[in-house]
Amino acid sequence: MSKQKLTTVFLLFIIVFGVSAQGKFNKFDENDQRHGPWKKYYDGTKLVRYEGTFSHGQEVGTFKFYKRLGKINYLAATKEFNEDGTVQVIYYSLGKKVISKGKMVGENLIGKWVYYHKDSDQVMTSETYDEEGTLHGVKQIYYPHGQLAQEVIYVHGKRENIELYFAENGTVIKKYHYENDQLHGLAKHFNDRGDKILEGTYKRDKRTGLWKWYQNGRIIKEKDYTYIPKFKKKQ
């Protein structure tokens, strides 16, 4: 067989195989619901936008989503559809590092979500959501090398109880109290050696009463934030 005929046969094989492969994707069932493997491309390109499998209109298994960047695309997210209606989601950077991961139901984040520092395997933020998609539970933020930087408690989307800030050496440097998502109660600031440098009280997000500033264990400044009306109503 001549070289020209071999080339022709090879091209025909590629065309037939390509058509056959394309025929496996993007099918509908008798009710016009997407069914079987699907693969969609960015308009006018051969760059895949997403791929996954449908079962009579419902996503099943793992879907892959790609982000276009000029003439290339890269894996930007995976979604694993579970039988209980939850979706396990992972977002990726261009460098194939995990950006964040957690579960969703519909548009709502639920359960524990973890976010990572840029181009790193170190956790940046860990937080928990309730079934309505609002923050609920302990939220923690970390320094790039893994030390805890901040911790606060949420109850159905609102900060409650104690919020703590930490220096990289683990020392508490700020301590606040929250009630119904407002600063309410005693507040204290410390340096990274644990020495108190500020103390005062909040009432519904506003400073109130006597605030004190410290240096080397001694008070160096005081200021009274007690509210005093400028005008008294006539009797």
Residue ranges and their predicted role:
Residues M1-F25:
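Bacterial Sec-dependent N-terminal signal peptides
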Residues V19-Q235:
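Glycine/tyrosine- and acidic-biased, solvent-exposed loop/turn segments at the edges of beta-strands
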